[in-house]
Amino acid sequence: MEKKIIKKKLKEIKLSGNYRIRKIKDSGNSHLFLYKNKEYLSFASNDYLSLANDKRIINAAKIALDKHGYSTSSSALISGFTSSHHKLEEEISEFLGQEKTLLFSTGYQANLGVIKALVSRGDNIIADQLNHASLIDGSILSRANFRRYNHNDYKDLEKIILKCKAKNNLIISDSLFSMDG
């Protein structure tokens, strides 16, 4: 019975044009990549500074692999926080002129962690409808009241703010809206 339901749902997704197929790249990490022997410029890369293939970074990663192995074997809060992590946080703090730095392994985790730290139950989060999924998930998981305003519609945002009775309001807007293509 379940297979029929899944097959039906997959068919609906395919017919709607929302069925995704992973493309197999023929190259490593770069803003340029090979796909079926043709070179493309990637607008979907997370390698924002084009450092993925920088020889200095690769050599530093090799040294870290030799020293620490492939995995920390645990989250940073349990027992996976290494001397290299600590040194990096200290160097970033010094570079930025800040007391402390907290590193997250992904932007998604950073958004979840920071939003949860800023709000509590009873607070309000008011967010743009086209925010990245990580901002939406972080808002929902924070357990604050969550409302969304129409994309880039600051009059709609103002209406929502005026209706909010909470002591603390957090307005969240993406800087580059990537979720709608």
Range-by-range predicted roles:
Residues 50-51, 78-81, 133, 154, ...:
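Short, small-residue-enriched loops and turns at beta-alpha junctions
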Residues 147-181:
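Active-site phosphate-binding strand-loop segment of PLP-dependent enzymes
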Residues 114-133:
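Conserved PLP-anchoring active-site segment centered on the Schiff-base-forming lysine
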Residues 121, 141-143:
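Short, structured coil segments at secondary-structure junctions
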